[in-house]
């Protein structure tokens, strides 16, 4: 989510709705109008001052109308109407000055630039683009770490650390997030292509579907590897800066920015694996659909096409690929014999679960009583100390389950103010075997 969207979220909804109503904002962009806007954007980029005259807009409208023949002729009247519509929707701005002898000049608005940029610059998602963006983020993070290690006044931190993190690193993260959303759209496009293929010739459809599925799977795997490698480095850099600013109240604004970047980084890195998992499920669905369609082909249309392919082999040669699986040997008894022997085995699952629940409830009640003493006395709960003292009286094999129950009961009693201030707690040892816990002191009940 971009910084602009986050700022807008802080305002009341009714205030934002009133703002839209007051300025009469609206958008209506049929395909020909969108094409006209993109044509204006392309022509504008070719100009040094990014300004266009009315004649150039008429030329762009003529090009668009030539491709959209059903919309009508490219008359000056229709061109002026199209221009006025874009001006009314605040997509282009019209200026008139004496320098141009009263002729109007036009310039794209920020809204139009955003729309045209989406269709022109973000149409293609590539591993190279992602790699460059991740490299840029790493360079900016390195600058921030260097400035943080030097230290200085709050002004130095705000200018050389906070500014770089918020406006350089944060914006690049937003661009990466946008590119990932473009990749999501491309996956939907591939799915539509596969659906169209399955409605056509079966033999060609199977080959093309396999190609599309494999190509997209390989792309997602490469992207995930790239994200994983870069994500580990970025995570380390964020933790390094957090360690420097930890405990300094004057640098709390830097810690809050790092917390926001951490959330963005987690979302970016988790996208890759999630996209792969979803695509694997879709891949299996397509193959299952093809097998089911062949099995349920009542008219034997696929079989008929296969026989026809064999008949026409010499005119249209093809290759046949098959798999020869090894036979499985069945080692079960051919006949089952009833036996009167005593049954030996484990307790049923229901009984085991019931016994575990009884033990768990007793422990939870006992631990809850222990922690309530802190609440009654108004004393804070330092989970690190509480766990260490409590686990010391129990066998090592029980430490994991007991620690889980203690934490669960503690968070039911209260919370820590530090959690809402994005303060990262230190790791504390809770036993002599290397187990650690990271939790703020609970001081609100």
Curated annotation (Swiss-Prot):
CDD domains from the UniProt entry: MukF_C, MukF_N
GO biological-process terms attached to the record: cell division; chromosome condensation; chromosome segregation; DNA replication
Pfam family membership, one: MukF_M
InterPro entries per record: Chromosome_partition_MukF, MukF_C, MukF_C_sf, MukF_M, MukF_M_sp, MukF_WHTH, WH-like_DNA-bd_sf, WH_DNA-bd_sf
Keyword Ligase (UniProt): no
Swiss-Prot/TrEMBL keywords: Calcium, Cell cycle, Cell division, Chromosome partition, Cytoplasm, DNA condensation
Subcellular location: Cytoplasm, Nucleoid
UniProt-listed Gene3D superfamilies: Chromosome partition protein MukF, middle domain (1.20.58.590), MukF, C-terminal domain (1.10.225.40), Winged helix-like DNA-binding domain superfamily/Winged helix DNA-binding domain (1.10.10.10)
UniProt-annotated stretches for the region Leucine-zipper: 213-241
Record-linked HAMAP family: MukF
NCBIfam families registered for this protein in UniProt: PRK05260.1 (NF003615)
Function as written in the Swiss-Prot or TrEMBL entry: Involved in chromosome condensation, segregation and cell cycle progression. May participate in facilitating chromosome segregation by condensation DNA from both sides of a centrally located replisome during cell division. Not required for mini-F plasmid partitioning. Probably acts via its interaction with MukB and MukE. Overexpression results in anucleate cells. It has a calcium binding activity.
Official protein name in the record: Chromosome partition protein MukF
Naturally occurring in which organism (per UniProt): Vibrio atlanticus (strain LGP32) (Vibrio splendidus (strain Mel32))
């Amino acid at each position: 989510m971009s910084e602009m969207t986050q700022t807008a979220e802080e305002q009341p909804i009714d205030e934002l709705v009133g703002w839209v109503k007051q300025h009469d904002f609206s958008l209506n962009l049929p395909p020909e109008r969108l094409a006209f806007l993109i044509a204006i954007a392309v022509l504008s980029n070719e100009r040094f001052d990014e300004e266009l005259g009315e004649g150039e807009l008429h030329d762009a409208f003529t090009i668009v109308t030539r491709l959209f023949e059903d919309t009508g002729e490219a008359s000056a009247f229709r061109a002026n109407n199209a221009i006025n519509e874009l001006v009314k929707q605040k997509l282009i701005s019209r200026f008139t000055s004496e320098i141009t002898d009263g002729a109007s000049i036009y310039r794209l608005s920020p809204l139009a630039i955003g729309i045209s940029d989406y269709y022109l610059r973000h149409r293609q998602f590539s591993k190279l683009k992602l790699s460059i963006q991740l490299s840029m983020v790493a360079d900016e993070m390195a600058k921030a770490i260097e400035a943080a290690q030097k230290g200085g006044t709050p002004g130095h931190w705000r200018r050389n650390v906070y500014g770089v993190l918020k406006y350089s690193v944060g914006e690049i993260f937003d661009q990466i997030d946008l590119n990932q959303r473009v990749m999501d759209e491309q996956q939907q496009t591939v799915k539509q292509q596969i659906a169209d293929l399955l409605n056509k010739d079966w033999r060609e459809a199977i080959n093309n579907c396999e190609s599309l599925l494999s190509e997209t799977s390989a792309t997602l795997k490469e992207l995930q590897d790239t994200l994983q490698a870069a994500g580990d480095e970025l995570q380390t850099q964020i933790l390094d800066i957090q360690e420097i600013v930890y405990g300094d109240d004057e640098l709390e604004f830097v810690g809050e920015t790092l917390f926001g970047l951490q959330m963005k980084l987690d979302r970016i890195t988790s996208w890759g694996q999630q996209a792969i998992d979803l695509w694997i499920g879709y891949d299996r669905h397509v193959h299952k659909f093809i097998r089911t369609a062949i099995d349920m082909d009542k008219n034997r249309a696929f079989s008929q096409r296969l026989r026809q392919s064999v008949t026409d082999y010499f005119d249209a040669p093809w290759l046949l690929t098959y798999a020869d699986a090894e036979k499985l040997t069945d080692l079960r008894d051919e006949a089952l014999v009833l036996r009167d022997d005593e049954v030996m085995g484990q307790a049923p699952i229901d009984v085991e679960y019931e016994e575990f629940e009884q033990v768990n409830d007793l422990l939870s009640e006992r631990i809850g009583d222990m922690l309530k003493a802190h609440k009654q006395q108004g004393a804070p709960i330092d989970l690190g100390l509480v766990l260490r003292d409590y686990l010391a009286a129990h066998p090592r094999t029980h430490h994991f389950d007991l620690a889980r129950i203690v934490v669960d009961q503690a968070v039911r009693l209260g919370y820590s103010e530090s959690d809402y201030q994005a303060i990262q707690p230190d790791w504390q040892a809770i036993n002599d075997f290397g187990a650690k816990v990271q939790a703020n002191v609970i001081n609100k009940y």
